């Protein structure tokens, strides 16, 4: 069977050259006579892999020296707990901006550790927009402020990162890390599950300012303490070695594409193809405020569940798969991460045009 265009929100499409290299090296990595999956994480071979992955990420994101890159497990969902356990240490209070399902889950975990202030929310608008934050981030008696830069389920993103002067800004970038340029120095901590834009599931990356490490309460479990990973080069225990290896290959691929600025240009072109059609369509609609449309996750729907089901079935027959929207939103959703080629988006748009003609 030929490969399909996979529009899954995660685990998601990986670059074909990366998969081919994994296939080539699967049984015998670099002349070692063994697979990465069989290799000791203490070996010099793996030490070089994790170091190269860290260096590539630093280069691609222009990460300043005062930040650490940590390779973790547990997905972004575990970070919802790790962050307050490590950072909620002075005022026992944090600020959260609610922009979708994942930011709400992050807030709920933080509430188990300390006090949470909802700085702003777009829940009344069904998370179809990003709330205005002008003048709302002036409270200095917060240990940190948490945002989600891209809302995977709802299809919104921040156009401008909020300015927080004296409080660390923490960002969940799981679904748009490396898709567009960000000034890392604006953040105290950035975290992302790998399975959308970085690599396979099983790995989580945290980029954290060094002065935020080492302040966790003594009751913080060892494996939930950032200091544990910082002191041990992310090798305190066995890391998700295969996921780190594939992520390194994805970062190499991204560098070959011209880096983040080049991929951002391509991502804007890909999303414009789909948004331009949606804006002109008489059948398909997008619920998202146009000002805050995501480059990565694009929800859309037809007027009825019957048409949605028919659309999804016929799309699958054409090799356009995993387009069903999240159960909390319904309809369809096209996730067009870095690895999705322009041709995939163009084929989707072509099919949508045909479907509309058939269902006038």
From Swiss-Prot:
Catalyzed reaction equations: O-phospho-L-serine + 2-oxoglutarate = 3-phosphooxypyruvate + L-glutamate; 4-(phosphooxy)-L-threonine + 2-oxoglutarate = (R)-3-hydroxy-2-oxo-4-phosphooxybutanoate + L-glutamate
Subcellular location field: Cytoplasm
UniProt keyword annotation of Glycoprotein present: no
Single Gene Ontology BP annotation: L-serine biosynthetic process
Cofactor or coenzyme needed: pyridoxal 5'-phosphate
Recorded GO CC terms: cytoplasm
Keyword field: Amino-acid biosynthesis, Aminotransferase, Cytoplasm, Pyridoxal phosphate, Serine biosynthesis, Transferase
Record note on cofactor: Binds 1 pyridoxal phosphate per subunit.
Residues annotated for pyridoxal 5'-phosphate binding in this entry: 76-77, 102, 152, 172, 195, 237-238
Assembly notes: Homodimer.
Family according to the record: Belongs to the class-V pyridoxal-phosphate-dependent aminotransferase family. SerC subfamily.
UniProt-recorded name of the protein: Phosphoserine aminotransferase
